Amino acid sequence: MSRLSSILLIITLTTLQAIAQQTPGVAVLIVKGQTEIEGKHLGIRRIRTYDVSSAEIPQSFDGFRILFIADTHYPSLFTDRTLASLGTVVSEIAPDAIMLGGDYQEGCEYVEPLFATIMRHPPKYGAYAILGNNDIERCTDTIIDLMRAYDIKFVEDTAVRINKGHSHITVAGATNTYKAFEENPSPTLNLPPEEFVILLTHTPDYAEDQDIANTDLVLAGHTHGGQVTFLGFLAPVTASHYGQRFLKGLNYNTAGQPVITTTGIGTSRRNIRLFAPSEVVLLTLHSWSRNERLPEPDIAIDTRPYLSQPITIVPETTYQEPLNIPQKL
């Protein structure tokens, strides 16, 4: 297993409680307050935002914004009115790129209006997508054809570069059919370790079950945040072999790679959400120089809800001077 590059994540959460945890393979984690946009857009309860800083993000991508959308299950609870609201969200945010995490529809006829809405204002640096388990069970050819028609790049089992100036970042896509994990190794395995790589996977379990070497950040969905939970903290049904571990938000696989799991927008089986708000995820990338001094760590971890002060957690290996950032092999 390759060693991970040090990655600094400055995270603005929208959950009731933000808990910072020291995690293997990550040099610094800062939880920097919270922002919640609640009820502004019909059918989308919140926009969860993350600021992601890494030495492997090129300077030209500093401030680059990615909108991640998954599990629309259109129409389910996500009706015509809320579809229009999604279009408004995309328009107002005006991201540089859009990434789609699968489970788009509850019927083939709903795919085109969904993609048409998302791509009404095409992002400058493109849209990138994978399939979810629902999309593999039905409408697969229709979905892939419509991706092509709306200039959405289908990235399963491949990796593509997003070019900006003379630099680039890479987005890769995993195939999630559960039974195909061993047959479909991660498309990140042969990527150059110095690149900043985002891996799209429908289920977060893939990031734990597979070797995803050379991946800097995983974006996943599928769990719906439990869809029905006890006060947002405990879900009887998680749609994950790992229980609550990858239910929502930022977590880490055993290798220490960050996995962001969105609660998504729509529903499946039963049209109800309870303490599992629908959301889209907005990432802002920041180029971080290896020579920059890091924030002084707070030894005490504050777990109070609605954090207003940054919390810095630095593993012991990073207290050395000068700061040596481990690199991927």
Locate each region found by the language model.
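Acidic, histidine-bearing metal-coordination/catalytic regions of metal-dependent phosphoesterases
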Residues: 2-65, 76, 312-329
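Acidic, His/Gly-rich catalytic cores of divalent-metal-dependent hydrolytic chemistry
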Residues: 25-48, 255-326
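Beta-strand-turn-beta hairpins that frame and shape the catalytic cleft
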Residues: 45, 54-67, 152, 160-173, ...
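Membrane-embedded segments
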Residues: 60-145, 150-153
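Active-site neighborhood of phospho(di)ester-bond hydrolases with catalytic His/Asp-centered motifs
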Residues: 69-70, 97-103, 126-133, 155-157, ...
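Solvent-exposed loop/turn segments at secondary-structure junctions
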Residues: 72-75, 104-107, 133-137, 160-162, ...
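Binuclear metal-dependent hydrolase catalytic cores centered on His/Asp/Glu-rich metal-binding motifs
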Residues: 87, 144-145, 149-152, 158, ...
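Conserved beta-sheet core of the metallophosphoesterase superfamily
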Residues: 119, 204-281, 289-290
